[in-house]
A protein has these predicted regions:
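Gram-negative host-targeted secretion-system effectors, predominantly Type III and Type IV
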Residues: 1-206
């Protein structure tokens, strides 16, 4: 993911089938780079419990206009995201500033902190997740923790700094090693964090 300067502010850029789009969480659009009239409404994405799906039609470089109740045509590409806000935390914060200027007072900042693949995350026992210290929209569920070679950890996609989806890991099983953008990151390097994580792992086994 790159940061590209625009006339308004720097915004992250993602690619859909090779076409770059700005992620603008303030106005809730994906905006084609170089063609600002072509916009994808983020609310057109299907929201599920653990991810969002965007059905992308490369022939029009926009969201698929057909029914989502049936399997899509072969040319439609389905992209999974954890959160658009996590791509553009500055824009998401700007939107909340307009709606509720006091929103920051509800943010939890007195929690244990651990490092996950080079970034700092709060350990939120109440919500059972890790929440990135510098990006409150980037959260990782305790349920995503796996045990590999007797080590608790997470498969992290470095492009999003969140967990790799199962289909991404399935695609990697045919490779001799994980692709460069996916790493196994050990977790739990603090007593309080370790206790919360291990308790959740025991509950998941029941």
């Amino acid at each position: 993911m790159n940061i590209v300067n625009t006339n308004t502010r720097p915004r992250p850029v993602i690619e859909l089938d090779g076409t770059p789009f700005y992620v603008d969480a303030q106005w809730l659009y994906l905006i084609q780079v170089g063609n600002p009239d072509n916009r994808i409404d983020m609310q057109e994405a299907c929201s599920y419990k653990d991810h969002m799906e965007l059905w992308y039609d490369p022939t029009i470089k926009n969201v698929f206009l057909g029914s989502h109740r049936e399997p899509p045509p072969e040319h439609i590409q389905i992209y999974w995201f954890h959160s658009f806000n996590a791509f553009d935390p500055v824009g998401a914060a700007a939107l909340l500033d307009e709606l509720n200027p006091e929103w920051r007072s509800a943010c939890k900042t007195d929690l244990p902190i651990i490092a996950i693949a080079g970034r700092q995350f709060y350990v939120d026992k109440e919500d059972e997740c890790f929440c990135e210290v510098n990006n409150c929209w980037n959260c990782i569920s305790f349920k995503d923790i796996v045990r590999r070679k007797k080590i608790n950890g997470l498969y992290i996609n470095l492009n999003t700094h969140n967990t790799a989806f199962l289909h991404e890991l399935d695609d990697a099983t045919s490779l001799a090693s994980l692709p460069n953008h996916i790493v196994f990151a050990p977790v739990a390097n603090g007593r309080k964090a370790k206790k919360s994580i291990e308790k959740n792992l025991r509950q998941n086994k029941k």
